[in-house]
């Protein structure tokens, strides 16, 4: 906003600002705001493309409407909820053998004479 000069009165400055505000509100000052719906449309199309990539089972070569994409997303979310609601599988019923560190990497086992160097 410009500073008010003593030559130009306050009333004149306020009128100028209010006319500019009305022009913007009525749409005469179309600039970047006019491009906004197009950028929103591009963003939405990008989001639908991203959903198509993320949801498994969507055929690559077929055209799907936005409603079909959303329906597949909803079905996928419901499938995930069912899987998460199932109880986790327990340990196997067979014999459980503990893993011995010495069997896997003997160099990791510290002998008593080497422990004295640590303290």
UniProtKB/Swiss-Prot annotation:
Keywords for this protein: Biological rhythms, Myogenesis, Nucleus, Repressor, Transcription, Transcription regulation
GO biological process: cellular response to leptomycin B; central nervous system development; circadian rhythm; epithelial cell differentiation; heart development; metanephros development; muscle organ development; negative regulation of DNA-templated transcription
Family annotation (CDD domains): bHLH_dnHLH_ID3
Cellular localisation: Nucleus
Coiled-coil portions: none
Domain bHLH: 28-80
GO (cellular component) term, any one: nucleus
A Pfam entry, by short name: HLH
PROSITE patterns given in the database record: BHLH
Record InterPro entries: bHLH_dom, DNA-bd_prot-inh, HLH_DNA-bd_sf
Molecular function GO labels: bHLH transcription factor binding; leptomycin B binding; protein dimerization activity; protein domain specific binding; transcription corepressor activity; transcription regulator inhibitor activity
Function: Transcriptional regulator (lacking a basic DNA binding domain) which negatively regulates the basic helix-loop-helix (bHLH) transcription factors by forming heterodimers and inhibiting their DNA binding and transcriptional activity. Implicated in regulating a variety of cellular processes, including cellular growth, senescence, differentiation, apoptosis, angiogenesis, and neoplastic transformation. Involved in myogenesis by inhibiting skeletal muscle and cardiac myocyte differentiation and promoting muscle precursor cells proliferation.
Subunit annotation: Homodimer, and heterodimer with other HLH proteins. Interacts with COPS5 and COPS7A. Interacts with IFI204. Interacts with GATA4 and NKX2-5. Interacts with ANKRD2; both proteins cooperate in myoblast differentiation. Interacts with CLOCK and BMAL1.
Protein name: DNA-binding protein inhibitor ID-3
Gene of this entry: ID3
